[in-house]
Amino acid sequence: MAESWSGQALQALPATVLGALGALGSEFLREWEAQDMRVTLFKLLLLWLVLSLLGIQLAWGFYGNTVTGLYHRPGLGGQNGSTPDGSTHFPSWEMAANEPLKTHRE
């Protein structure tokens, strides 16, 4: 008699597990549908994030070399290049009238 009881329990186990999973799934769906505005807002924000990242990737593909070229100067000064020749000659309006001209060593 014990064998028939355990055999029936084993046969009923998959149906019980599937019934519990079905109840859990239906409860989850009810909660999901009840939070409709939150779900919609989440989907919109997720879509905005994905589209923004794709736009950045696409723009970098088109303009990446141009942007890199703006910040990279070939020369002896390293990654950003050397100092241009005319950069140390400031116009007189940028210096105070009584201030002496400073050199790089000061």
Curated annotation (Swiss-Prot):
Coiled coil: none annotated. One of its GO terms (cellular component) is membrane. Residues 81-90 have a biased composition (Polar residues). Pfam families: T_cell_tran_alt. GO terms for biological process: osteoclast fusion. The chain crosses the membrane at residues 9-29, 44-64. Residues 2-8, 65-106 are extracellular. The modification N-acetylalanine is found at residue 2. Keywords: Acetylation, Membrane, Transmembrane, Transmembrane helix. Residues 30-43 are cytoplasmic. It is a multi-pass membrane protein. Residues 74-106 are annotated as: Disordered. It is found in: Membrane. Belongs to the TCTA family. May be required for cellular fusion during osteoclastogenesis. This is T-cell leukemia translocation-altered gene protein homolog. The gene is TCTA.
